């Protein structure tokens, strides 16, 4: 019965559009379970475990029998039913691959939170040698610890053998045994030190590799992915979840493997000392297995909910701290504190509920173990009285059973950490396994000298993935001639910024095609398109908290200092940059908060121009500036637009009068198009927008304050 094991079959790998596969339970022996198999209480418990897990997992066709990703061995001869009775979730480690979660609606490639053993193996494989040494040392420390109860029993026999009158004989006979014990204690300490150091080495390196891979995966996701997920939740995956998984991984080896080995070894020793007492201890196994399985299922669900709530709280904090100036401007500190407090309160409730469950599990196990010790003393004392067991053997049995109890207690503490770690690891691997719809690279590149810059939108329809039922663009058709300026105007919500997003291929149209020089954008390399062809300048440019030099060079990493200076001059930025004490090495602060709006905008223009784009997108580039800053920035934009295909998005119609073509958008379509004069003569929507802005201008313009008059000199008549 000690070598009776579970083998859990899971088919690995995501299958879009399919349910996750079921489990198959087999024994290490030739016995195979069927639904009606009930030959013993242990087999009944195994079948009950199977039914419980089957109810919580989805189903699909079975995997090939010997597929390397299909079978995960949990246990060996060292993991008998006694171990699984206390720590059934060591079996469930393999089951978390089939854990079902709700997929994100806006990311079609998400298949749910499931532990990806294939990815885990990729991170573990480079460290297998070091990990193998750590495992050997941990097993050695555990086996040394198994020998100690037997030697203590022999020492007790020597103590009982001699009286006070034979102290010399006692010291002589116990010297070798005591020396042996001291050596074992020293070896155990050295082995423990060795495997803990090696585990720390493996765990930290794996954590770094996982964070790097997760960050790389997140950066490669579609813009739609970030539309649907908060930044704080993603940062939580990089920090909290990876840390949780790393801790669980190290604990499974340092405590789990060692404790399981000690339990198995001590059980073998116990059976050699007294088969009757050992069998009595094994009677509690099936009941503990069933209770542990039921409680583990509920605790796993609570752990997942707790982690999701923590991620939501972090999202609220990240949003408030990232927009602290807006919060301060509206005096909304109290409201943000209340929002964050509400999320923390929900976290507390979930965590306390999880803690109560873990405490209940540990409390019940302690009661069971204490009853087992009491029963051992009672029955063992009877055997000693009947001369069926010596006092030394009973002492060895008690110490060995205490070792089992202590190991089980460690597993009980480890239980909650493993549950949390597996949930965290499943979520980390879930994001690593995501495949973006629009890859970062792949496709053809057009030589720079062959690019003309002609852009065509042909019968384009588009809905944002997070709002699939709302169509933003409807049969939209537009051509941007090479070297010309085309302006998009219209009321808010008409789809102007969406056109720019499609041109940068942040999204793909749901219908129709976007072409560059007659080539479908979907056939071109996205990184080449964004990195060398299209330059983008938005209304509120985002700068990084580094130097001005590095912010401009962000548009072209290999650019020389002279290229940076030239781009700054072209953007009318060189003069104000050199006025700073540190010049181009000036730190701009987080998101460029130390610069004015006009200064940030000119740096953004320089960043876009340094890569010499063929197509330039100006999305409300001057709408947030004052008159003087707008004049300086507009001069830079006029120089930047020369010889390039330019798409201008504007609300202030006065800024687009010089465009070669003005396109008025309404309801996701081209309403009318022409030059400024042509559209005014037509008297359509554009003329109406001009008239409205002319009427609104006097009301929105703030009158200049009058210059205060100085004191008058009054002449008094005499």
UniProtKB/Swiss-Prot annotation:
GO terms for cellular component: mitochondrial ATP-gated potassium channel complex; mitochondrial inner membrane; mitochondrion. PROSITE patterns: ABC_TM1F, ABC_TRANSPORTER_1, ABC_TRANSPORTER_2. It is found in: Mitochondrion inner membrane. It comes from the Eukaryota. SUPFAM superfamilies: ABC transporter transmembrane region, P-loop containing nucleoside triphosphate hydrolases. Residues 133-420 form the ABC transmembrane type-1 domain. Residues 1-25 form a transit peptide. The chain crosses the membrane at residues 128-148, 179-199, 279-299. Residues 455-692 form the ABC transporter domain. ATP binds at residues 490-497. GO terms for molecular function: ABC-type oligopeptide transporter activity; ATP binding; ATP hydrolysis activity. InterPro entries: AAA+_ATPase (IPR003593), ABC1_TM_dom (IPR011527), ABC1_TM_sf (IPR036640), ABC_transporter-like_ATP-bd (IPR003439), ABC_transporter-like_CS (IPR017871), P-loop_NTPase (IPR027417), Type_1_exporter (IPR039421). Its main location: mitochondrion. Channel activity inhibited by ATP via ABCB8/MITOSUR subunit. Keywords: ATP-binding, Ion transport, Membrane, Mitochondrion, Mitochondrion inner membrane, Nucleotide-binding, Potassium, Potassium transport, Transit peptide, Transmembrane, Transmembrane helix, Transport. GO terms for biological process: oligopeptide export from mitochondrion; potassium ion transmembrane transport. It is a multi-pass membrane protein. Belongs to the ABC transporter superfamily. ABCB family. Multidrug resistance exporter (TC 3.A.1.201) subfamily. ATP-binding subunit of the mitochondrial ATP-gated potassium channel (mitoK(ATP)). Together with pore-forming subunit CCDC51/MITOK of the mitoK(ATP) channel, mediates ATP-dependent potassium currents across the mitochondrial inner membrane. An increase in ATP intracellular levels closes the channel, inhibiting K(+) transport, whereas a decrease in ATP levels enhances K(+) uptake in the mitochondrial matrix. Plays a role in mitochondrial iron transport. The mitochondrial potassium channel (mitoK(ATP)) is composed of 4 subunits of CCDC51/MITOK and 4 subunits of ABCB8/MITOSUR. Physically interacts with PAAT. Interacts with Neuropilin-1 (NRP1) in mitochondria. This is Mitochondrial potassium channel ATP-binding subunit. It comes from Pongo abelii.
């Amino acid at each position: 019965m000690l070598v009776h094991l579970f083998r859990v079959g899971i088919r690995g790998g995501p299958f879009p559009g399919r349910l996750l596969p079921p489990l198959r339970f087999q024994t290490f022996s030739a016995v195979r379970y069927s639904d009606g198999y009930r030959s013993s209480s242990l087999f009944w418990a195994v079948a009950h475990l199977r039914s419980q897990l089957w109810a919580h997992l989805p189903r699909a066709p079975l995997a090939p029998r010997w597929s390397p990703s299909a079978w995960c061995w949990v246990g060996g001869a060292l993991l008998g039913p006694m171990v699984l009775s206390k720590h059934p979730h060591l079996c469930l480690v393999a089951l978390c691959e089939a854990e079902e979660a709700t997929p994100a609606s806006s990311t079609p490639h998400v298949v749910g939170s499931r532990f990806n053993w294939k990815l885990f193996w990729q991170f573990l494989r480079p460290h297998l040698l070091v990990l193998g040494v750590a495992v050997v040392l941990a097993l050695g420390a555990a086996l040394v610890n198994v020998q100690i109860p037997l030697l203590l029993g022999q020492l007790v026999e020597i103590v009982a053998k001699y009286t006070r009158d034979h102290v010399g004989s006692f010291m002589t006979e116990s010297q070798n045994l005591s020396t042996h014990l001291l050596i074992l204690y020293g070896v155990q300490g050295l082995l423990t030190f060795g495997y803990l150091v090696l585990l720390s080495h493996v765990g930290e390196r794996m954590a770094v590799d996982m964070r790097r891979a997760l960050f790389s995966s997140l950066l490669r996701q579609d813009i739609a992915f970030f539309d649907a997920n908060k930044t704080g939740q993603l940062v939580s995956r990089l920090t909290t979840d990876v840390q949780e998984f790393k801790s669980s991984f190290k604990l499974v080896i340092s405590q789990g493997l060692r404790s399981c080995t000690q339990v198995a070894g001590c059980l073998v020793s116990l059976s050699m000392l007294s088969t009757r007492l050992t069998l009595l201890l094994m009677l509690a196994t099936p009941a503990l297995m069933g209770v542990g399985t039921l409680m583990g299922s509920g605790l796993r669900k609570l752990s997942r909910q707790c982690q999701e709530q923590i991620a939501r709280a972090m999202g609220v904090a990240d949003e408030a701290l990232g927009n602290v100036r807006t919060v301060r401007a509206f005096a909304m500190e109290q409201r943000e504190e209340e929002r964050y407090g509400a999320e923390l309160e929900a976290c507390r409730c979930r965590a306390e509920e999880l803690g109560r469950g873990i405490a209940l599990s540990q409390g019940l196990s302690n009661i069971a173990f204490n009853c087992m010790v009491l029963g051992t003393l009672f029955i063992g004392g009877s055997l000693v009285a009947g001369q069926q067991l010596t006092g030394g053997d009973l002492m060895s049995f008690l110490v060995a059973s205490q070792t089992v109890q202590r190991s089980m207690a460690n597993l009980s503490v480890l239980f909650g950490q493993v549950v949390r770690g597996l949930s965290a690891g499943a979520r980390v691997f879930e994001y690593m396994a995501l495949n973006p719809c629009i890859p970062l690279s792949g496709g053809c590149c057009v030589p720079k000298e062959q690019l003309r810059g002609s852009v065509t939108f042909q019968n384009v329809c588009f809905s944002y993935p997070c709002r699939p039922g709302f169509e933003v663009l409807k049969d939209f058709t537009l051509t941007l001639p090479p070297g010309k300026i085309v302006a998009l105007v219209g009321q808010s919500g008409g789809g102007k910024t969406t056109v720019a997003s499609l041109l940068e291929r942040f999204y793909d149209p749901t219908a129709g095609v976007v072409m560059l020089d007659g080539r479908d954008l979907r056939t071109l390399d996205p990184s080449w398109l964004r990195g060398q062809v299209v330059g983008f300048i938005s209304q509120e440019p985002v700068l990084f908290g580094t130097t001005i030099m590095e912010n401009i060079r962000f548009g072209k990493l290999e650019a020389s200092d002279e290229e940076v200076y030239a781009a700054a001059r072209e953007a009318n930025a060189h003069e104000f940059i050199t006025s700073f004490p540190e010049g181009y090495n000036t730190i701009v602060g987080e998101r460029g908060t130390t610069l004015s709006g006009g200064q940030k905008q000119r740096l953004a223009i320089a960043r876009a121009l340094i890569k010499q784009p063929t197509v330039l997108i100006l999305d409300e580039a001057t709408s947030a500036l004052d008159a003087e800053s707008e004049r300086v920035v507009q001069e830079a934009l006029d120089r930047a637009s020369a010889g390039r295909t330019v798409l201008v998005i504007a609300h202030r119609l006065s800024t687009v009068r010089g465009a070669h073509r003005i396109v008025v958008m309404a309801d996701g379509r081209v309403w009318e198009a022409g030059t400024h004069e042509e559209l005014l003569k037509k008297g359509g929507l554009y003329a109406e927008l001009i008239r409205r802005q002319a009427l609104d201008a006097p009301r929105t313009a703030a009158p200049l304050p009058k210059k205060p008059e100085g004191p008058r000199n009054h002449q008094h008549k005499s």
